[in-house]
Amino acid sequence: MVPRGFFITFEGGEGAGKSTQIHLLADRLRREGRDVLTTREPGGSPGAEAIRHVLLSGAAEPFGATLEAILFAAARSDHVEQVIRPAVESGAIVLCDRFLDSSRVYQGVTGGLASDFMAALERVTVNGLIPDLTVILDIDPEEGLRRASERRGKATADRFEKENLEIHRRRREAFLNIAAREPQRCVVIDASRSADAVSENVTEIVLRVIFDRAGLSEPTEAGSV
């Protein structure tokens, strides 16, 4: 029987550096000979990517927050069953840019949807697949939006980046509240530092999770597990 892999999600506000950190971590793990899959939400599977365009373009906004949350849930369900679950069951390390915590924050806290409704959607869409580790990259929203704008260049900002600063501040607080409620799953990392400094911190934490699963007290040599 193939040992179960790891499911690691990255969360945080706009411009926190999630995609950058996933790329750096994936490179490090692959150099150690590990099987790594990188993916994102909304998206990650053909069906979910089609829904992603509708969601990020703002085309779903006229239909209201409830239908929009259902679209996010549909994308996640397809992503989980077509991509994430098979990869984890095959022994891969899956690194995902956003997952259930983003729905809790964006559609729940700042979208105004009831927590019991969001919890019901979550149960159906993830079907028991909860991340082994969630890395929350924490950054001041003003700095995050500045970085996002710099990264984007002349491209059009997506609908979430266009929202007012107070909403971004509420989202930051909501992510930190999730981390406080679920310390066994979540770790908060200061993302205001350089990408290399953040990457070093992320790698140390992820390797600790891997070594703990293997029953070793401390990493002794890269790639030895």
UniProtKB/Swiss-Prot annotation:
Coiled coil regions, renumbered to chain: none
InterPro entries: P-loop_NTPase (IPR027417), Thymidylate_kin-like_dom (IPR039430), Thymidylate_kin_CS (IPR018095), Thymidylate_kinase (IPR018094)
Physiological role: Phosphorylation of dTMP to form dTDP in both de novo and salvage pathways of dTTP synthesis.
A Pfam family assignment: Thymidylate_kin
Family of the protein in this entry: Belongs to the thymidylate kinase family.
Family annotation (HAMAP family): Thymidylate_kinase
Gene Ontology cellular-component terms listed: cytosol
Gene: tmk
Entries under SUPFAM superfamilies matching the protein: P-loop containing nucleoside triphosphate hydrolases (SSF52540)
Enzyme Commission number(s) of this protein: 2.7.4.9
Name of the protein in question: Thymidylate kinase
Residues where ATP binds: G12, G13, E14, G15, A16, G17, K18, S19
MF term (GO), any: dTMP kinase activity
Catalysed reactions listed for this entry: dTMP + ATP = dTDP + ADP
GO biological process assignments: dTDP biosynthetic process; dTTP biosynthetic process; dUDP biosynthetic process
